[in-house]
Design a protein with these regions (language model features):
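Acidic/histidine-rich alpha-helical segments that form the ligand environment
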Residues: 8-12, 77-114, 134
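Surface-exposed helix-capping loop/turn segments at secondary-structure junctions
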Residues: 22-27, 106-114, 150-155
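Short, contiguous alpha-helical
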Residues: 29-73, 116-155
């Protein structure tokens, strides 16, 4: 596995701790922009989607080019259930699950990494591309959390 993927799998998510440092739980849960997710909802989305991603990776490894539907957090009962948990519980699960996920993924063989699945918008992607997609999607939400936290720290 390329080091740029393995390094991000190991460490990228940990920036969340720094991004929300100094914010109260009330601030983390505050909706800064009307109709948009709070920091908390972005974090819950990352935590919930990570579990879905693991399931999809397993389907890719076990199947022959499976096709996945578009994911919608609002339609995912796990997302809604997880919104009732504390920020600490969500972060703990995100970090623990990522550690387990990464330790398995860095062991994938070349044959594993070239297995494919269909993405509804991007078409056929191999497992390495799926990992990159996962990390870029996560980075997008981390940047959103960064912007929301900056806004909250100004007020």
């Amino acid at each position: 596995m390329p080091s740029n993927i393995s390094t991000r799998l190991h460490y990228q998510h940990k920036s969340l701790i720094d991004l929300i440092d100094g914010l109260s739980d009330e601030q983390v849960r505050r909706q800064v922009n009307i109709g948009k997710w709070s920091i908390f909802e972005n974090i819950v989305h990352l935590q919930t989607y990570q579990h879905l991603f693991i399931a999809r990776v397993n389907q890719i490894l076990e199947g022959t080019n499976p096709a996945f539907p578009r994911y919608s957090a609002e339609a995912d009962p796990s997302f809604l259930d997880n919104c009732s948990l504390s920020t600490r519980e969500i972060l703990q699960d995100l970090i623990t699950t990522r550690k387990d996920m990464t330790s398995g993924m860095v062991q994938f063989s070349h044959d594993d990494l070239i297995k494919t699945a269909e993405h509804p918008a991007f078409g056929k992607m191999n497992l390495l591309q799926w990992m990159n997609f996962f990390l870029l999607h996560e980075a997008h939400h981390l940047f959103t959390v960064f912007k929301l936290a900056a806004e909250l720290k100004k007020s």
